[in-house]
């Protein structure tokens, strides 16, 4: 039974997901269905958490839109998004960046990781 589940899980995993971590800025191209039409909408923000493993792995992206914080959680291996673009790498020391919810303006800015 476990090998059957492993086979199904392996078949549903996506291979086009880039390696990203909390603190990174990503641009998620989400497929939005409105009535009988579908279009691609971009959701650009900072990854504040990544949790789970396998098929049930999720990540949460936070952005500020018109001075209102918006967070959206996506399954990593979901067909709902076209692609994930890695914009910048962030230099953080935490796995969960929930403290960004209380910060405003420049205080909520994350340092960019330098490539050495």
From Swiss-Prot:
One of its GO terms (cellular component) is cytosolic large ribosomal subunit. The keyword Ribosomal protein applies. One of its GO terms (molecular function) is structural constituent of ribosome. InterPro entries: Ribosomal_bL19, Ribosomal_bL19_CS, Ribosomal_bL19_sf, Translation_prot_SH3-like_sf. One of its GO terms (biological process) is translation. It holds the Pfam family Ribosomal_L19. SUPFAM superfamilies: Translation proteins SH3-like domain. The keyword Ribonucleoprotein applies. Keywords: Ribonucleoprotein, Ribosomal protein. NCBIfam families: rplS_bact (TIGR01024). Belongs to the bacterial ribosomal protein bL19 family. This protein is located at the 30S-50S ribosomal subunit interface and may play a role in the structure and function of the aminoacyl-tRNA binding site. PANTHER family: LARGE RIBOSOMAL SUBUNIT PROTEIN BL19M (PTHR15680:SF9), RIBOSOMAL PROTEIN L19 (PTHR15680). This is Large ribosomal subunit protein bL19. It comes from Streptomyces griseus subsp. griseus (strain JCM 4626 / CBS 651.72 / NBRC 13350 / KCC S-0626 / ISP 5235). The lineage of its organism: Bacteria, Bacillati, Actinomycetota, Actinomycetes, Kitasatosporales.
């Amino acid at each position: 039974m476990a090998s059957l589940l492993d086979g199904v899980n392996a078949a549903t995993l996506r291979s086009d997901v880039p390696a990203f971590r909390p603190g990174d800025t990503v641009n998620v191209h989400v497929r939005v269905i409105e009535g009988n039409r579908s279009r691609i909408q971009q959701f650009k923000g900072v990854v504040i958490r990544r949790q789970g493993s396998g098929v049930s792995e999720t990540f949460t992206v936070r952005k500020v839109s018109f001075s209102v914080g918006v967070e959206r959680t996506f399954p990593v291996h979901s067909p709902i998004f076209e692609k994930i673009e890695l914009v910048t790498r962030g230099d953080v020391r935490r796995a969960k960046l929930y403290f960004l919810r209380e910060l405003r303006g420049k205080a909520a800015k994350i340092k960019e990781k330098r490539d050495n």
